[in-house]
Curated annotation (Swiss-Prot):
Function description: May regulate flowering time by modulating the photoperiod pathway.
Induction description: Expressed with a circadian rhythm showing a peak before dawn.
Comp. bias (Acidic residues): 512-525
PROSITE patterns with a match to the protein in the record: PROTEIN_KINASE_DOM, PROTEIN_KINASE_ST
UniProt protein name: Probable serine/threonine-protein kinase WNK6
The keyword Transferase belongs to this UniProt entry's keyword annotation: yes
Claim: Coiled coil is one of the keywords in the record: yes
Recorded coiled-coil stretches: 519-553
Protein family per UniProt: Belongs to the protein kinase superfamily. Ser/Thr protein kinase family. WNK subfamily.
Bias-annotated ranges (Basic and acidic residues): 499-509
Length: 567
């Protein structure tokens, strides 16, 4: 009886906004209408089990019974939604027939920003980067539909049937009422919205590439804000133009040649039209394509395997740099195998950088002491092709050894092509220079002995006072100090440039063997100082840009992790 009483309470809710409850008492329908079509009304609803807002699609049976085709469309949509699961296809939750109220009810996920058409008209000033992002998501949904066995054709793709969550730009294809499973090689029936229908649809002989034509028209609508063929007064005029191969007038208003070319690819005759899978590879849609400010490509985040070390380690892997490197190997002598150790001051905290080369790869280990217990380390590995791997990790002074951390790093991050001992030597060299009492667990005396001697002598060298001083050591050469305002540690992708820039500074501004050098002229000194200032200005400019990109990458990764946890 208690359950019955609860049910009665739910069926007659005190909230005046709640108009209806589903048979399982899980979903409640509000009176707020969020969409309306010829036969279907969409209400805002709430899932009381998962605590999320959903869409309650309701169709009156009396309305669809007047048109048997509409009833079949409705059942077709329910069947398809139940079977499809993809990030860019609207998600189905439940459906039922209410005999008492004579309605068919479908619960789907809710899109707070409505249709893409409505959203685009509301936000008219949107960068092409966002439009490309929407296009990629639509194509990924189409690739999924067309990749089914047998393929599924949407047949009514338009911005009205594509939905968006504006808070994070998620786009999904919906309204599958006209979709069909292509049992034969070609479908036969004529159906869809005339403005978006491919020419072959009128000939009743088409396949899934008809959706690509519609997608092209969606792109046209997204960039012009108008329905294709809005110059036509009726469907007959549209049919006449489409069958004659006349493109919409709005296509001539697309000024960006790349955008126009991409749309035209989608509107080619069916025999020449590319598939969704092929269009996703088009240069126009590539993530690293040119945008307004030509950003640097973002690194991919590589998560370590599960384990204790994985909790304090992260690797990002970037593509080869597009900027030529002229100074990458100038001051790293692979034959001597001796490292370069650099000291700098970062807001009162001492930073140390160790650089070393091995078999065409260049290693840069940077460290900054957090407190008495731990040191923040960043290892950059730059291969001969310019690809950069960046490993961020914490080193605990009590309990950690260079060999232990190096072994775990190579195993967890699958750095199979790197030598454990080589990385351990880098770590111990840095720690010996940072912590005077540090006890190494690998032999590094042969690598640091001459450096320590040079370090004691370098304090006698005269140099102009600067905001920051770096003392650089290299095998038999004693190098005098020079200024460098770069902070340590630096950001991910920028480090590749920063390594190159630092090496350029070393070559151009550091005098070589003490007894073999001659005094530098004032003009030469001024030229070198200007060169350093130019490098620093360029560095600061790039750092500002990469910091923004890094933040975006971190936020995107966090979002993906959150979505994975929800699944």
């Amino acid at each position: 009886m208690e359950g019955t009483d609860d049910a009665s309470a739910l069926q007659e809710p005190p909230d005046p906004e709640v108009l209806e409850v589903d048979p399982t008492f899980r979903y409640i329908r509000y009176k707020e209408v969020i969409g309306k079509g010829a036969f279907k009304t969409v209400y805002k609803a709430f899932d009381e089990v998962d605590g999320i807002e959903v869409a309650w699609n309701q169709v009156r049976i009396d309305d669809v019974l007047q048109s048997p085709n509409c009833l079949e469309r409705l059942y077709s949509e329910v069947r398809l939604l139940k079977s499809l699961k993809h990030n860019n296809i609207i998600r189905f939750y439940n459906s039922w027939i209410d005999d008492k109220n004579k309605t068919v009810n479908i619960i789907t996920e809710l899109f707070t920003s409505g249709s893409l058409r409505h959203y685009r008209k509301k936000h008219r000033k949107v960068n092409m980067k966002a439009v490309k992002n929407w296009a990629r998501q639509i194509l990924m949904g189409l690739r999924y539909l067309h990749g089914q066995e047998p393929p599924i054709i949407h047949r009514d793709l338009k911005c009205d049937n594509i939905f968006i969550n504006g808070n994070h730009g998620e786009v999904k294809i919906g309204d599958l009422g006209l979709a069909t499973v292509m049992e034969q090689a070609n479908a036969k029936s004529v159906i869809g919205t005339p403005e978006f229908m491919a020419p072959e649809l009128y000939d009743e002989n088409y396949n899934e590439l008809a959706d690509i034509y519609s997608f092209g028209m969606c792109m046209l609508e997204m960039v012009t804000f108008d329905y294709p063929y809005c110059e036509c007064k009726n469907s007959a005029q549209i049919y006449k133009k489409v069958s004659s191969g006349i493109k919409p007038a709005s296509l001539s208003r697309v000024k960006d040649p790349e955008v126009k070319q991409f749309i035209e690819k989608c509107l080619l005759p069916a025999s020449e039209r590319l598939s969704a899978k092929e269009l996703l590879l088009d240069p126009f849609l590539q993530l690293n394509g040119l945008t307004m400010n030509n950003p640097l490509p973002l690194p991919d985040i590589v998560m370590p395997k599960e384990g204790a070390f994985g909790d304090r380690c992260l690797m990002s892997e970037g593509p080869p740099t597009t900027r030529p490197s002229k100074t990458l190997s100038i001051d790293l002598d692979e034959d001597s195998n001796l490292p370069i150790v650099t000291f700098s001051d970062n807001s009162g905290s001492r930073c140390i950088e160790v650089r070393r080369a091995k078999r065409g790869n260049f290693f840069v280990l940077k460290g900054e002491e957090n407190d008495e217990q731990s040191v923040s380390l960043i290892l950059r590995i730059v291969d001969e092709n310019g690809r950069v791997r960046n490993i961020h990790f914490l080193f605990y002074q009590e309990g950690d050894t260079a060999s232990k951390v190096s072994s775990e790093m190579v195993e967890q991050l699958e750095l199979t092509d790197q030598n454990v001992t080589f990385i351990a030597e880098l770590i111990d060299i840095l720690l010996v220079n940072m912590i005077p009492t540090w006890k190494t667990d690998v032999t590094v005396d042969h690598l640091i002995h001459s450096q320590l001697n040079q370090n004691s002598r370098s304090h006698h060298n005269e140099a102009k006072p600067q905001k920051q001083e770096e003392t650089v050591f290299h095998d038999t050469c004693e190098l005098v100090s020079h200024s460098c305002n770069s902070d340590c540690p630096r950001s991910d992708e920028e480090d590749k440039q920063c390594v190159d820039a630092t090496k350029g500074e070393d070559k151009s501004s550091i005098q070589e063997v003490e007894e073999a050098t001659e005094p530098v002229s004032l003009e030469e000194e001024e030229r070198l100082r200007q060169e350093l200032e130019e490098i620093e200005a360029k560095y600061q400019e790039d750092m500002k840009e990469i910091a923004t990109k890094r933040e975006e990458a971190i936020m995107e990764t966090k979002k993906k992790l959150s979505l994975m946890k929800l699944k």
